Design a protein with these regions (language model features):
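Per-blade loop-tip surfaces of WD-repeat and WD-like beta-propellers in eukaryotic adaptors/scaffolds
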Residues: 3-9, 32-49, 68-92, 117-135, ...
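Hydrophobic packing within well-folded, soluble alpha/beta domains
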Residues: 30, 54, 94-97, 106, ...
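Conserved strand-to-loop turn within each blade of WD40 beta-propeller repeats
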Residues: 24-27, 65-69, 109-112, 150-153, ...
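Canonical WD40 repeat/beta-propeller blade segments in eukaryotic WD-repeat proteins
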Residues: 10-11, 17-22, 49-55, 92-98, ...
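Residue-level detector of Asp-centered blade-edge/turn motifs that repeat once per structural unit
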Residues: 16, 58-59, 101-102, 142-143, ...
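Cationic, amphipathic, low-complexity alpha-helical segments enriched
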Residues: 1-3, 12-18, 24-25, 205
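C-terminal closing repeat unit and adjoining cap/tail of repeat-based domains
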Residues: 188-189, 205
Length: 205
């Protein structure tokens, strides 16, 4: 991935015509709502904690609900209201979740200062990357071989999954927490968003 100009050191998109919407909630459970009628069509049990982030697999089969210390995976096409798999390993709130393009693995970020990669078939932990501060967000690069994460210390890190190392460390603004990261679909542009005084500042890195 080419990193544009900036300070660095080198080593819910909705589907068109969507009929259901899933809100984030500070209390369990998760609910499916019919977007046009406003009727709650289904409820999923999430008893352990609040729900921080939601993500649907690319094949629209599963829903991941990230809570306090774990992620629960639900079968969307099943009538079972309980999770079919639970991913345990974080020690604080989970702040980000994303799926590989074929749903083979999942990545999570957490206030415990780590980014973790999970095998969605076995539920096992495959990678563990450490920040020096709470991590607010993580995304997968379109090449599926890199992760980009942002933390409360104001650092954006690029992780190479093949080599299992941090290849770039970027600092949009010193000591200003990075709340959100996003990468263009062709991988040509990486953006980070922070909150400084009032409003959000987005910077091209």
């Amino acid at each position: 991935m080419t990193i544009p100009s900036g300070r660095y050191s080198k080593p819910l998109q909705l589907e068109k015509n969507l009929s259901n919407a899933l809100p984030l909630t500070s209390v369990a459970p998760c609910r499916f709502w019919e977007a046009l009628s406003g009727i709650c069509s289904r409820t999923l049990q999430h008893p352990d904690s609040q729900v921080n982030r939601l993500c649907i697999t690319p094949d629209k089969r599963y829903l991941a609900a990230a809570g306090h210390t774990n992620v629960k995976l639900y079968d969307i096409k099943s009538s079972n209201p309980n999770p079919v798999m639970t991913f345990d390993g974080h020690t604080n709130n989970i702040t980000g979740v994303a799926f590989h393009c074929e749903g083979k693995w999942m990545v999570t970020s957490s206030e415990d200062g780590t980014v973790k990669v999970w095998d969605t078939r076995s539920g096992s932990l495959q990678r563990n990357y450490v920040h020096k501060a709470a991590v607010n967000d993580v995304v997968i690069h379109p090449n599926q071989g890199e992760l980009i994460s942002g933390d409360r210390a104001g650092t954006v890190r690029v992780w190479d999954l093949g080599e299992s190392v941090c290849t770039h460390q970027l600092i949009p603004e010193d000591d200003i927490a990075v709340h959100s990261v996003s990468v263009a679909s062709d991988g040509s542009l990486l953006c980070a968003g922070n909150k400084k005084v009032s409003g959000n500042n987005f910077r091209r890195l």
